[in-house]
Amino acid sequence: MLVLGWLTVLLGVLAMETYVPALRTLSELLDKGVEHSKAKGIDAAALLKERLAPDMFPLALQVQLACHHAKDGTARAIGQEPPKIDTSELPFTELKALIEQTVQTLSTTSAKAFDGAEDRRIARA
């Protein structure tokens, strides 16, 4: 357990209640992007290559990295080898599937797996 002043936070609960809702929101935003592109007659695939700023990654890679960080952080916290990331370009449907697969992976990780995580040294990759 991680002790923050008077507040004790279970790392597993914290991870699940942070990553899962954020990933579900990201999935909904992708749906809105597809709807917007249809309404405006824009190629939806083109949106995946867009960047909010010149020094940012394209949207598709941002989604992949969000999934990777959720899985990677969780794996490292519970003492497992983090999964490899595939950064090949994916269409909207596959990005949504990646998000759902990440949510499922996180959802099947038991809070008990985080026991001792507060004392575990995590090496930077």
Predicted regions, residues:
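Mature, function-bearing regions of proteins
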Residues: 9, 16-20, 92-108, 115, ...
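Helix-loop segments that flank and shape redox-cofactor active sites
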Residues: 29-57, 73-87
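Short, highly charged low-complexity linear segments
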Residues: 83-91, 122-125
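Alpha-helical scaffold segments that form or flank carboxylate-/histidine-based iron centers
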Residues: 8-21, 43-66, 86-95
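Conserved alpha-helical segments that form or flank metal/cofactor-binding pockets of metalloenzymes
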Residues: 55-83, 102-110
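Acidic interhelical loop/turn segments
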Residues: 37-49, 108-125
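Amphipathic alpha-helices that form helix-helix packing interfaces
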Residues: 19-22, 26-29, 33, 66, ...
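N-terminal low-complexity segments that are often proline-rich with Ser/Thr-Pro
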Residues: 1-5
